[in-house]
């Protein structure tokens, strides 16, 4: 028998992967350079604004950004990592939901009516909120701080601590001095009859 010759396929033409990778790297570097130029131009603009705010003299001439761009173009060999973008402005913390009143920074000069309201007022009746106060105090076990925050959040009214203490004392089963039923006369008559 005649020896069979193995059919050998010619090797595939070499792909220019190296050229492909180089072209991708060049594209990435071009994009990075453009981004850096954009950041540089933003930095220069912000610096120019800061300088113009500090010294308003019109005789100060700013250098043109074109020569600086040529000097700031990094070479491929020296660039190891892209520069981080400039820091964002510091955000103020969100206002807590349980804080009340106006902050000093909101308005420079409050309206005259608000100045009058800031003064101490006389007696105010909390009777309209009695049911909400008593129910909240009973549900939270007489915790004044929690009841204050809860009522402020859900009813939008900042109840004074002394009012909550008063209603806890009168209507709460957790305090010994309170009647627990809401009626002052029934608790005192039972104490007199037994004692």
Curated annotation (Swiss-Prot):
Q: Which domain of life is it from?
A: Viruses
Record's note on what induces expression: Expressed at the late phase of the viral replicative cycle. Probably already expressed from the early to late transition.
Residue segments, region Disordered: 1-124
Q: One GO biological process from the UniProt record?
A: viral DNA genome packaging
User: Residue spans with biased composition (Low complexity)?
Assistant: 54-63
Matching entries from InterPro entries are given as:
Adeno_L4-33K/L4-22K
- What are the GO cellular component annotations? host cell nucleus
Where is there biased composition of kind Acidic residues?
A: 15-53
Q: Where in the cell is it found?
A: Host nucleus
Disulphide connectivity of cysteines: none
Q: Tell me which Pfam families the record gives.
A: Adeno_L433K_22K
Transcription regulation as UniProt keyword? yes
Q: Which UniProt keywords apply?
A: Activator, Host nucleus, Host-virus interaction, Late protein, Repressor, Transcription, Transcription regulation, Viral genome packaging, Viral release from host cell
- Major location (coarse): host cell
Subunit text: Part of a genome packaging complex composed of packaging proteins 1, 2 and 3; this complex specifically binds to the packaging sequence on the left end of viral genomic DNA and performs packaging of the viral genome. Self-assembles into higher-order structures.
Q: Which family does it belong to?
A: Belongs to the adenoviridae splicing factor family.
Print the miscellaneous field: All late proteins expressed from the major late promoter are produced by alternative splicing and alternative polyadenylation of the same gene giving rise to non-overlapping ORFs. Expression of packaging protein 2 and splicing factor is controlled by a L4 promoter distinct from the major late promoter.
Known function: Component of the packaging machinery which encapsidates the viral DNA into preformed capsids and transcriptional activator of the viral major late promoter (MLP). Binds, along with packaging proteins 1 and 3, to the specific packaging sequence on the left end of viral genomic DNA and plays an active role in packaging of the viral genome into preformed capsids. Specifically binds to the 5'-TTTG-3' nucleotides of the repeats making up the packaging sequence. Forms a transcription factor called DEF-A through cooperative binding with packaging protein 1.
What is this protein called in UniProt? Packaging protein 2
């Amino acid at each position: 028998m005649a020896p069979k010759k193995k059919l050998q396929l010619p090797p595939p033409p070499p792909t220019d992967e190296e050229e492909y990778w180089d072209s991708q790297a060049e594209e990435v570097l071009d994009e990075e350079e453009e981004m850096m130029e954009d950041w540089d131009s933003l930095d220069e603009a912000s610096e120019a604004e800061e300088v113009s705010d500090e010294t308003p003299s019109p005789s100060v001439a700013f250098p043109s950004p074109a020569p600086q761009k040529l000097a700031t173009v990094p070479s491929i060999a020296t660039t190891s990592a892209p520069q981080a973008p400039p820091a964002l402005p510091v955000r103020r913390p969100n206002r807590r939901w349980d804080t009340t009143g106006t902050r000093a920074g909101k308005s420079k000069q409050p309206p005259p009516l608000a100045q009058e309201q800031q003064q101490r007022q006389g007696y105010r009746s909390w009777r309209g909120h009695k049911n909400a106060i008593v129910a909240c105090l009973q549900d939270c076990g007489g915790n004044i701080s929690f009841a204050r925050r809860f009522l402020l959040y859900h009813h939008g009214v900042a109840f004074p601590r002394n009012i909550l203490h008063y209603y806890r004392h009168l209507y709460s089963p957790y305090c010994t001095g309170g009647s627990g039923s809401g009626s002052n006369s029934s608790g005192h008559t039972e104490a007199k009859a037994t004692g």
